[in-house]
Amino acid sequence: MTTHFMRSYAELCIKTCHRRNIHAMGGMAAQIPVKNDEKANAEAFARVKADKEREATYGHDGTWVAHPGMVELAKEAFDRLMPTPNQIALKKRDDVKVSAADLLRFEPEAPITEAGLRLNINVAIQYIGAWLAGQGAVPIYNLMEDAATAEISRSQVWQWIRSSKGKLDDGRTVSKAMVAAMIPEEMSKIRQLLGSAFGEGRYEEASVIFADLVNNDNFVEFLTLPAYERID
């Protein structure tokens, strides 16, 4: 949320809402408590704390979290930084001057990496596989994910394949062939990660859907459209 276009839309949202005297809600913190890993758990709580402090400082009037275990942390941040019921009158954000160009400034802060490409493939397949089996919210790598995550993942891969800037930091070009080679490798990782739970999802079907989505030269509007066709 600190990249240029994301901060721009967040602050514009606050300004727009407060001009109309309505509440500007912050976003969801996807982190969830991590069992049996004290360091990872502490990192998750630290990320949520920083996220909610940023939202309250920007001028949001409330927020939400993905897990009830994070409610008290979010509440503490807002109670401390927003002692009033809301910030509608206090932070009109007339200082915010956001243009269309600001909202379209998507320059990445870091290069595309093989690890990032693989993570997009892995997470998208995990989510779609669980979605086909009836789950809408899916814990993946200590984050509570919904369809938006899989949408971002498959959209980035689709774009990297077709963009002249779709190159990894080592100079290799992201291609359909590269992604096709990585899909079975990531499937093996998912199978190993989930163990017996692998059979509870529909991951083989998910990998086919993902491959079809990124290989289709016409960008499919929503990944759930072809996925719905596989639901009885």
Task: Describe the role of every protein-language-model region.
Residues 1-232:
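Expand to "…catalyze enediolate/carbanion chemistry for C-C bond making/breaking, isomerization
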